[in-house]
Amino acid sequence: TNSITIENPPLLELALNANPTSCSNTLDGEVQAIVNGGTGGYIYTWDNNLADQDTHTGLLPGEYCVTVEDANGCQVNDCITVGSPPELIIESITFQEVDCNGNNTGSATVTASGGTGNYDYLWSDSLAQISATAVFLPAGTYTVLITDETGCQVSESVTVTEPDLLEINFDATDALCKDESNGSATAIPVGGTEPYEYNWVTGSTEATANNLAEGDYDVTVTDSRGCQAEANVVIGEPTDAVALTLDQTEQGCFGQSQNEAIALPTGGTGNNYTYQWSDGQDSQTAI
């Protein structure tokens, strides 16, 4: 009688190792399948359509599963997760508008979360500022780059605005007659930030300055942010005062009503004169 001893191959065992990605969205994760036992000639079948090999690099975060089969068809399987640090994100980015057109009083502030450790900041302004808040900014678009302690980065842009340039238009009325003070001027601001304050050279603090004689008048307009504009308006007057010449055009006999007189005005404004005679007549010619 003969006997034979049938020996089992060593137990097929599988262990998985994983290295996390350096950042939440980088392709540098790694998995490794470590196999012991069984009967050589291992075949690796990964669920993620990865190649038949024990180690894979350049991976995104996520779960990776593998089935290992030896030369005898024995199988073992397991899964492992390639981790990552918390995603570095920008929670908010806000700005403070420039106070007056053309100034550099704007600012921008960024708030970030996630990532690893402390953050470094770099703004795209002319000063290349390196804090969470960039100051002394003129109007424009700025980008901030945030880097955490492992080198992960995120960036975002913000546009710092400014009010329109404060300017002054006028609605002016000339003096009606030469050497009179009945002209007026209204300052009409555009741009800046309402409400406005007015300071005329005459001392008036209203939008309209009244009782103006012929001449130049300066006004300063200040908006709600302290921005100022200065401008000048000219009040005119007729070139000449109204002058009147009377002429007798018809002469009748003594005691009769055949006399006729005509008024001949010059100067003033335009040719649309009105007349008032002492006897009540209101035409240019009195009979």
Where are the regions that the model predicts?
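Proline- and Ser/Thr-rich low-complexity, intrinsically disordered segments
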Residues: 1-287
